[in-house]
Amino acid sequence: MANYTAADVKKLREITGAGMMSCKKALEEADGDFDKAVEFLRIKGAKDVGKRAERTAAEGLIAVSGNTMIEVNSETDFVAKNAEFKEFADKVAKAADEAKANSAEDLAAVNVDGTPAEEALQAFSAKIGEKLALRRATTIDGDNVAVYLHHRSADLPPAVGVMVAYEGEGDAAKEAAHNAAMQVAALKAKYLKREDVPSDIVEKERSIAEATSREEGKPEKALPKIVEGRLNGFFKDVVLLEQPSVADHKKTVKQLMDEAGVTLTGFRRYEVGQQ
């Protein structure tokens, strides 16, 4: 008897992009364990696992003020385009920066014209006739912060926001940090440096790399070198300083920062509708 449901198969397909039969087989092999089924599909070559899992259904915008970034959600992009909606979000972002908001709870409580942001949001929501949500907020430490806001189209507000904290002086440093922010927006780095990646995630990636190599029939003697190569590929994908720079593909982000005399100390990335 199957120890999974049709809903499990559907969810696995949505997350991985794999076919129905592949998802069924993965759940069978994993004895119904969803996380193990995802790993099974990764070993078998599913490419979008994890990236699809980050998506949620939402419209809205990203707003930044000072060292603080917020996400405000709406039900439709029609409201997201509304100039009043953007003005409201900017006002909340300014209040959030003053309060150093670092969570949805912090954001809901910040003072907007003498009113908690959540109450101000509900009043604005009633005015425009659509449900709105203060989804999240984050504040980054640092005296120097480069900001990049990406618009998916000219008539829509920013859907991606990045803040990069850095140490460095002068126009060259500012330009380098701004390029780093654009890099984060485009290539979605998750960590600043290799040491920031949690050890359990590294070991999980190592295990998957080894299992994938065996699945492909690689020689046992060559496995250690192949696994390390794949692990380095993983780091290049998720670690900002190790990524090839979008500004100069022949150099890593770290090399370009070193040339500009810049030390990156942290970053935050928000995208509307993603976790």
Curated annotation (Swiss-Prot):
Span list, region Involved in Mg(2+) ion dislocation from EF-Tu: 76-79
Range of residues in the leader sequence: none
Principal subcellular localisation of the protein: cytoplasm
Cellular component, GO annotation: cytoplasm
A single MF term (Gene Ontology): translation elongation factor activity
InterPro entries given in the database record: EF-Ts_dimer_sf, Transl_elong_EFTs/EF1B, Transl_elong_EFTs/EF1B_dimer, Transl_elong_Ts_CS, UBA-like_sf
Coiled coil region boundaries: none
Cellular compartments annotated: Cytoplasm
Entry keywords, A to Z: Cytoplasm, Elongation factor, Protein biosynthesis
Regions that span the bilayer: none
Domain of life: Bacteria
Database matches in HAMAP family: EF_Ts
Role noted for this protein: Associates with the EF-Tu.GDP complex and induces the exchange of GDP to GTP. It remains bound to the aminoacyl-tRNA.EF-Tu.GTP complex up to the GTP hydrolysis stage on the ribosome.
Protein family: Belongs to the EF-Ts family.
Name the UniProt record assigns to this protein: Elongation factor Ts
